[in-house]
Amino acid sequence: MGIRVAVAGASGYAGGELLRLITGHPEFDLVAATAHSQAGHRLDTVHPQLTGLELVLAETDPAALADADLVFLALPHGESATLAAQLPPKVRVVDLGADHRLADPYAWANYYGGTHAGQWTYGLPELPGQRERIAATTRVANPGCYASAIVLALAPLIAAGAAQPADVVVVAASGASGAGRAAKAHLIAGEVMGDLSPYRVGAHQHVPEIKQATGATSLSFTPVLAPMPRGILATVTAVPVRDVDPQAVLAEAYADAPFVHVLPEGRWPHTAATLGSNSCHLQATVDVDAGRLIVVSGLDNLGRGAAGQAVQNANIMLGLPETTGLSVWGVSP
């Protein structure tokens, strides 16, 4: 018997990707999966891509997760904290929701509402010292999908004194799976295909998370819904502090990071190259007219932006090589 793993909230897109990764992981044994509306259904009927996975979804409650060594929480924002508080301290927990990402209760109230549950260790291993913090805890808050792409692009530039922390501007496009699996009129094919539409302009909930993780002091973020199932492409711009090669700064920061790839000069990220992988692709330059630093970041919002990153964090928590059970390469086209 390997490491016993349970997934709470297994019926959604992130939950389905978690199940795919867990069942292919050489050290993990899936012992439980839970859901609300889909409880009582076999996993392979809820997720047709998991043909032959006969485990039946249980109701989401602590008893269903009691036999697990490792629990992934893929629940809507506001639901993870209550369930996590009822799990034994020795159980390792990775929360893919937002409940434990923010340190500031006022930021939580402004962007999410409700009671602030407190902060867990932030699960972005590539930040300085973060692998060690993740390895030493039993509770990890997985970053948001947009935050993953943007923090990886921006954090090294601010940390190196190459970019000003103020006046950061981001425009990022995401596939429709980022909005979840629940039926919504604006996400049906007839609405999404052939269209680009911004949403939560100037008030996206990942803004305080990005500022917290990068040290940015002001951030203008415009998210865009793109006509594709999955993937994120973020363009991050910042004011330089000094004459600097942003690509060189990023390359040095991620020289030993197996899942972050600073592309050769002249090659720019595109989402299809990252699909199915836990990788983030980066490229950077200086705007010849405005003089601003530009970093483009691409990743799979369900992989590196959710389930893949959660497994990477779990590997570190368990003392396993962080690449175990994860792909560096995408499946394009």
UniProtKB/Swiss-Prot annotation:
Top-level taxon: Bacteria
The enzyme's E.C. designation: 1.2.1.38
Source species: Salinispora tropica (strain ATCC BAA-916 / DSM 44818 / JCM 13857 / NBRC 105044 / CNB-440)
Matches recorded under HAMAP family: ArgC_type1 (MF_00150)
Lineage: Bacteria, Bacillati, Actinomycetota, Actinomycetes, Micromonosporales
Subcellular location: Cytoplasm
Protein name: N-acetyl-gamma-glutamyl-phosphate reductase
InterPro entries: AGPR_type-1, NAD(P)-bd_dom_sf, NAGSA_dehydrogenase, Semialdehyde_DH_NAD-bd
Family recorded in the similarity comment: Belongs to the NAGSA dehydrogenase family. Type 1 subfamily.
Gene3D superfamilies the UniProt entry points to: Dihydrodipicolinate Reductase, domain 2, NAD(P)-binding Rossmann-like Domain
CDD domains (alphabetical): AGPR_1_actinobacAGPR_like, AGPR_1_C
Function: Catalyzes the NADPH-dependent reduction of N-acetyl-5-glutamyl phosphate to yield N-acetyl-L-glutamate 5-semialdehyde.
